Amino acid sequence: MNKKSRLVLVDGSAYIFRAYYGLPPMNRPDGTPINAVFGFTNMLVKLIEDYSDDKMIVIFDAARENFRNKIYPEYKANRGEAPDDLIPQFSIIRECVDSFSIPQLEIEGYEADDLIATYSKSAKNNNIETIIVSSDKDLMQLVTENITMLDPMKNKKIGVKDVEEKFGVKPEEVIYIQALTGDKVDNIPGAPGIGPKTASQLINDFNNIDGLYKNLDKIKQEKRRNILIDSEKEVRTSLELVKLKNDVDISLSINDIKTYAEIKNQNKKIFKFLKEQGFKSTYERLKSNAFISNNIEDNKIETVSKPNYILVNNKKEFENILNEIRKKGLCAIDTE
């Protein structure tokens, strides 16, 4: 394996939702919603351009229930179903990943975070630098000097110091903070009334959950001590929920993952996919990218109907348009 190649782990499921909620509704000519597909596609293109010499895999959550629901049946029970216009986009996004010939993986019974933790451990054992493409706080427990995170929306890297500033403890101690504070979004109980600041103080004083409960007599605040005593079972359950599994049986090894530079000759599927979705701006941008568009025939994206527009190229026409907008009371602008 090329020692210079890094491992790029893309948290696909998390980014789908960020793309969906971060972009306005968009539809294909046939009415299929594609705003999340559009955002995801452009994120993937940016990653390929930036990390073409590195090994990349996109990881998704499988079914909603996993081994954590056996530990705590109420885990994530408060989450509703995905929006109706997002559901049909899941399969299209998987088509997108396939069109770029990037490997993708999901395993029944586990969350994407567990697979990311497993790959990160394997990479660490083989001295391979790892980049986790996600801003999910649950993954920050994995950060080391050799494992960083990348927030694709902000194009910001998250390292050890960033995690320490956020939680007040080392990355490997983040799980203790989460066990104490709980998580309303994921329905993780924690200890009621224990916030991040207090949790940070406790872990800095006692190192971990076991150390904390062995030294409850050293906690001067009676109310705090009683809360911890009463919620010990919930705290220990929460610790099991937030700790990521790093030993999932994965058939696709790091050595089996190729860099994009090695697979770019399979890129005809990319342009076929972009045409099918009507992503004209992305199509044109990639067509001019010699690295991605190697030997691609220039087939224009077919339009469903003839263009119908008014060209505004003088002040009078502009004023007429403004008057029309005032009459209607609403104006939509497409900046693609």
Predicted regions and their residues:
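Short alpha-helical segments and helix-capping/turn motifs at coil-helix boundaries
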Residues: 40-46, 117-121, 226, 318-319, ...
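Extended two-metal-dependent nuclease catalytic cores across DNA- and RNA-processing enzymes
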Residues: 2-5, 24-27, 77-251
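Structured, non-catalytic alpha/beta "coupling" segments that mediate domain-domain communication
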Residues: 48-59, 129-141, 145, 230-246, ...
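Long, highly charged low-complexity segments
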Residues: 257-336
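Short, basic, glycine/proline-bearing loop/turn elements
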Residues: 24-33, 97-107, 298-312
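Basic, polar low-complexity surface loops/patches
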Residues: 16, 36-37, 47-51, 89-98, ...
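Non-catalytic, usually N-terminal nucleic-acid engagement modules in DNA/RNA processing proteins
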Residues: 1-61, 67-71
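Short hydrophobic beta-strand that contains or immediately precedes a catalytic carboxylate
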Residues: 9-10, 134, 331-333
